[in-house]
């Protein structure tokens, strides 16, 4: 603020209390943030927080990212939300611990090492398994180091010096021990059922390892001839499938009890057609016309002969029945029966059953006790047909690169040759793919190890149910809170409907299934599995000391079995555990076993993306219910996916990816963190260049607010403080009331993980209530008053605001609030992250005062709008040139205005409140009734110090100033 000067008038600028601060308006975050990271490490902020005594523990348990590749924007979102949860709870008085972790075993790393081998012309099979596992370990270690630094650069606090990793020896020992609890409690069994199988990676996959993409598939309509069916003998049941490769494994056809079927006779055919005149087809009536159209048959080329009761059909012959060279492979009669899962919404109204490749068919024949008659083993690990399968031996369902193999075409050609095909086509549909290789998967019956979710768990922990499923569902109902609440239903429905858990993988890099099976025994035999606590204890001790590699060492079987068992009577299992069992066991080796874990092995919060309802939330729940008897968490918090600015999924091919490292280099990590705080993370979020520009603009506005406070508090001391709010003007008491209200909002928001709500409330308060209103009004007092009560009150309020705004925003803007804090408290060990949210007295709340100020602000809006017209028309240059007359109809409002300095609030040199009706020419705002403003110029001279135009300017000891400024000059 400068004053006009003349030769006779002194320069008063140096007498003003102008803000003084070295806090720069330009943040320079990319360059400066690393300095604060170094400082925090030097002064040991995380460890010093752990030294605070008497605090209730709060534990957010980290869902481990995979130790493979640089961070993507989803990682940044995830870890930033976690960091805000941890920091805010620490500042609310908890001992908020955070142990970051990494998931290290599994297919993605194996795949990378195998890729390296392939480039060198080598195969994994050429290398000793322990040597291969060591290469996988080194690969994971390298990426852990890289990702750790990338996470730290985002300002994520935590025990980075001692994270948990699932390949640590202790972790591997506990994972094996948790598995052996399933072995001992009766839920582990070996079974054979269709599982999702990746021919490319040659292993079973969990649902969480599968993603769905559009795929073009062959679709065929195939004829099965009825036999032992009386008048229907020779008629053909038509099935439809999108997996022609499963036809050689067909064992049955099923129909729906409530579907109407008809017999259709072919009366004519076009030139190119696989139907013949006189053929009779059995079809669902609702689908018959569609099937005929697919077979190129016009409506006048077929007729409906009559109804068909499918229960009268005694059996079917396979289309390859009696085929020359078939060696009798398909010559037995195919079963034909009703099934609940058959519909007439698409296809033919019949379903071809290959129970080795479909779960519904498998379960149907399992429940009938007929599995032995219908299970085939035609498809090998690599997705090829067994070598001795007639016509198709050695044919691949998928090529080695994951493309279409030669199996489907070969099957279709053979069906054409034997007259078994009615129609063919292509269909584009959503199809499961391996999330790692991106290649399609198949369903394939293989021997696997399962954890039963419905067998009683014999561990004496039945408070929440006797089975894993019961315990999980009861935990969801009674023990776990969900944010957002929709996550509850999603997880519940998944657990309610899920099959048994496939634990085994046919891979090398993982924790092995540490169990032994008796040679010659069947999986259903009571002594099939060795259940011996002494053997288990030896395994655990060895893994603890040497890691899981010792399972593969020479003589391992003899070592673990000990002297009580003959090694040649037992087989050692070499499958490895599903990696979701690894991460699902973290409650044991992190929460239970670490000093910075939890007393009961249960976390306050698990927080991950919404895909983890079928991933980590899911596997952790199942695993803990099998060993703890209940869920391992009290709160499940879920975030959505990150999309580009147009709401499109990010992909390298579209060129719309946002890389966290690039954002940090351009804007700084605080801008990325602020984006997280501004968004509703519970839904899908959007990010892109324009969105980030908007975030940076919001940041600058907040930074400007903090800079103003720092400048105005440059020489503030305790002697300046006014302790009793009653001694303050109404405007300051209003700010105190708003602070108390906001303190409650902030604490409630942080406790409920509502960062968008916290940020929105604080940002609006800082920019609307403070910068655009309170600061704007009080600049005159702060700059021009002497040692007055109202200036002391304003600075007291600024100090109180400073301590609250910096701490409230510290969990979000970790770097900037540290910079702001150190500007006032630059001590060597000082940090905003070492303090708590200040206690804010509830007595500050004054709803009546808030209501009064709201009324005043409505009047002020009309005055400000009226003056803006005068400024626009160049009648005035500043509002201080005005002294308007404000006509207020409401007597209560007039009385309120009489109690305050309304001209100061409107930033005018004078203002008259009138009870007279407003004249016609008065300015009004339609949304604010009963207030009219008549513009008047201020009378008097311009004070050369405060710039107000007042009648008394020039009548005091100091030349060219008003009475207030004269008193300030002394």
From Swiss-Prot:
GO terms for cellular component: cytosol. GO terms for biological process: isoleucyl-tRNA aminoacylation. A motif ('HIGH' region) lies at residues 65-75. PANTHER family: ISOLEUCINE--TRNA LIGASE, MITOCHONDRIAL (PTHR42765:SF1), SOLEUCYL-TRNA SYNTHETASE (PTHR42765). HAMAP family: Ile_tRNA_synth_type1 (MF_02002). Its EC number is 6.1.1.5. Catalyzes the attachment of isoleucine to tRNA(Ile). As IleRS can inadvertently accommodate and process structurally similar amino acids such as valine, to avoid such errors it has two additional distinct tRNA(Ile)-dependent editing activities. One activity is designated as 'pretransfer' editing and involves the hydrolysis of activated Val-AMP. The other activity is designated 'posttransfer' editing and involves deacylation of mischarged Val-tRNA(Ile). Keywords: Aminoacyl-tRNA synthetase, ATP-binding, Cytoplasm, Ligase, Metal-binding, Nucleotide-binding, Protein biosynthesis, Zinc. It catalyses: tRNA(Ile) + L-isoleucine + ATP = L-isoleucyl-tRNA(Ile) + AMP + diphosphate. A motif ('KMSKS' region) lies at residues 649-653. Its main location: cytoplasm. Its cofactor is Zn(2+). GO terms for molecular function: aminoacyl-tRNA deacylase activity; ATP binding; isoleucine-tRNA ligase activity; tRNA binding; zinc ion binding. The gene is ileS. Belongs to the class-I aminoacyl-tRNA synthetase family. IleS type 1 subfamily. It is found in: Cytoplasm. Monomer. Binds 1 zinc ion per subunit. IleRS has two distinct active sites: one for aminoacylation and one for editing. The misactivated valine is translocated from the active site to the editing site, which sterically excludes the correctly activated isoleucine. The single editing site contains two valyl binding pockets, one specific for each substrate (Val-AMP or Val-tRNA(Ile)). This is Isoleucine--tRNA ligase. It comes from Ruegeria pomeroyi (strain ATCC 700808 / DSM 15171 / DSS-3). L-isoleucyl-5'-AMP binds at residue 608. SUPFAM superfamilies: Anticodon-binding domain of a subclass of class I aminoacyl-tRNA synthetases, Nucleotidylyl transferase, ValRS/IleRS/LeuRS editing domain. ATP binds at residue 652. It comes from the Bacteria. Zn(2+) binds at residues 943, 946, 962, 965.
């Amino acid at each position: 603020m400068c004053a006009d000067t003349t030769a006779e008038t002194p320069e008063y600028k140096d007498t003003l209390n102008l803000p003084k601060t070295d806090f720069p308006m330009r943040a320079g975050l990319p360059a400066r943030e690393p300095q604060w990271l170094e400082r925090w490490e030097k002064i040991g902020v995380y460890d010093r927080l752990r030294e605070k005594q008497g605090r209730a523990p709060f534990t957010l348990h980290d869902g481990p990212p995979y130790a493979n590749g640089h961070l993507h924007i989803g990682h940044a979102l995830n870890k930033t939300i976690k960091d805000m949860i941890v920091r805010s709870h620490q500042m609310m008085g908890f001992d908020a611990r955070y142990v970051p972790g990494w998931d290290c075993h599994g297919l993605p790393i194996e795949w990378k090492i195998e890729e390296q081998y392939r480039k060198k012309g080598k195969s994994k099979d050429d290398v000793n398994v322990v040597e291969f596992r060591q290469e996988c370990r080194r690969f994971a270690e390298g990426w852990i180091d890289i990702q750790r630094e990338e996470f730290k650069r985002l300002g994520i606090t935590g025990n980075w010096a001692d994270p948990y990793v699932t390949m640590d020896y202790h972790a591997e020992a506990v994972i094996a021990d948790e598995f052996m609890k399933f072995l001992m409690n009766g839920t582990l069994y070996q079974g054979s059922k269709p599982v999702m199988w990746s021919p490319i990676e040659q292993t079973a996959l969990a649902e969480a390892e599968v993603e769905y993409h559009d795929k073009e598939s062959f679709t065929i309509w195939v004829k099965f001839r009825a036999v032992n069916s009386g008048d229907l003998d020779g008629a053909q049941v038509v099935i439809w499938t999108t997996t022609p490769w499963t036809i050689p494994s067909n064992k049955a056809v099923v129909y729906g009890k409530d579907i109407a079927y008809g017999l259709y006779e072919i009366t004519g055919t076009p030139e190119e057609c696989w139907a013949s005149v006189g053929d009779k087809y059995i079809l669902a009536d609702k689908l018959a016309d569609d099937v005929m159209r697919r077979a190129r048959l016009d409506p006048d080329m077929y007729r409906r002969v009559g109804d068909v009761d499918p229960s009268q059909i005694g059996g079917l012959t396979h289309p390859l029945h009696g085929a020359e060279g078939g060696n009798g492979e398909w010559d037995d009669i195919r079963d034909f029966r009703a099934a609940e899962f058959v519909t007439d919404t698409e296809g033919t109204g019949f379903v071809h059953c290959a129970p080795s490749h479909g779960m519904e068919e498998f379960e149907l024949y399992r429940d009938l006790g007929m599995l032995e008659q219908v299970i085939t083993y035609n498809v090998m690990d690599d997705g090829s047909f067994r070598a001795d399968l007639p016509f198709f031996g050695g044919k691949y369902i998928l090529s080695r690169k994951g493309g279409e193999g030669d199996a489907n075409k070969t099957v279709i050609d053979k069906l054409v040759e034997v007259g078994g095909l009615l129609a063919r086509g292509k269909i584009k549909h959503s199809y499961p793919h391996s999330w790692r290789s991106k290649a399609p998967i198949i369903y394939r019956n293989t021997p696997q190890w399962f954890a039963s979710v419905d067998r009683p768990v014999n561990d004496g922990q039945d408070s929440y149910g006797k089975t894993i499923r019961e315990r999980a569902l009861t935990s969801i109902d009674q023990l776990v809170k969900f944010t957002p609440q929709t996550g509850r239903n999603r997880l519940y429905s998944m657990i309610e409907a899920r099959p048994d858990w496939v634990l085994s993988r046919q891979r090398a890099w993982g924790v092995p299934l540490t169990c032994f099976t008796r040679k010659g025994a069947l999986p259903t035999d009571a002594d099939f599995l060795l259940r011996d606590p002494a053997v288990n204890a030896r395994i655990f001790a060895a893994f603890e000391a040497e890691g899981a590699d010792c399972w593969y060492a020479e003589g391992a079987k003899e070592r673990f079995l000990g002297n009580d068992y003959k090694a040649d009577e037992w087989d050692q299992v070499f499958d490895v555990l599903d990696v979701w069992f690894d991460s699902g066991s973290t409650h044991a080796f992190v929460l239970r076993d670490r000093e910075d874990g939890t007393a009961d092995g249960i976390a306050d919060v698990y927080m991950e993306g919404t895909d983890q309802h079928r991933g980590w939330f899911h596997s952790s729940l199942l695993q803990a219910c099998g060993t703890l008897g209940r869920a391992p968490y009290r709160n499940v918090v879920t975030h959505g996916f990150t999309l580009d600015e147009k709401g499109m999924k990010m992909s390298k091919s579209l060129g719309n990816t946002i890389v966290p490292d690039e954002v940090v280099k351009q804007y700084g990590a605080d801008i990325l963190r602020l984006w997280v705080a501004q968004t509703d993370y519970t839904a899908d979020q959007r990010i892109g260049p324009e969105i980030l520009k908007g975030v940076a603009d919001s940041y600058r506005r907040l930074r400007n607010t903090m800079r103003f406070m720092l400048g105005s508090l440059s020489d503030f001391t305790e002697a300046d403080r006014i302790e009793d709010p009653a001694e303050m003007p109404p405007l300051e008491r209003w700010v105190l009331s708003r602070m108390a209200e906001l303190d409650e909002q902030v604490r409630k928001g942080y406790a409920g993980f509502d960062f968008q709500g916290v940020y929105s409330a604080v940002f609006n308060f800082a920019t609307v209530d403070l910068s655009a209103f309170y600061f704007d009004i009080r600049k005159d007092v702060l700059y021009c008053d002497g040692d007055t009560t109202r200036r002391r009150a304003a600075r007291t309020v600024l100090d109180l605001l400073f301590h609250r705004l910096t701490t409230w925003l510290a969990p979000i803007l970790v770097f900037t609030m540290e910079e702001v804090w150190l500007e006032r408290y630059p001590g060597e060990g000082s940090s905003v992250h070492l303090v708590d949210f200040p206690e804010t007295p509830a007595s500050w709340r004054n709803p009546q005062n808030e209501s009064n100020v709201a009324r005043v602000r409505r009047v002020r809006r009309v005055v400000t709008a009226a003056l803006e017209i005068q400024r626009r028309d160049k009648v005035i240059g500043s509002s201080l040139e005005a002294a308007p007359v404000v006509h207020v109809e409401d007597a209560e409002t007039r009385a309120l205005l009489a109690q305050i300095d309304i001209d100061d609030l409107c930033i005018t040199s004078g203002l008259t409140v009138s009870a007279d009706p407003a004249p016609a020419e008065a300015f009004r705002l339609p949304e604010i009734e009963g207030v009219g403003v008549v513009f008047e110029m201020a009378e008097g001279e311009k004070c050369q110090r405060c710039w107000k135009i007042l009648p008394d300017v020039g009548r005091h000891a100091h030349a060219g100033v008003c009475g207030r400024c004269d008193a300030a000059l002394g």
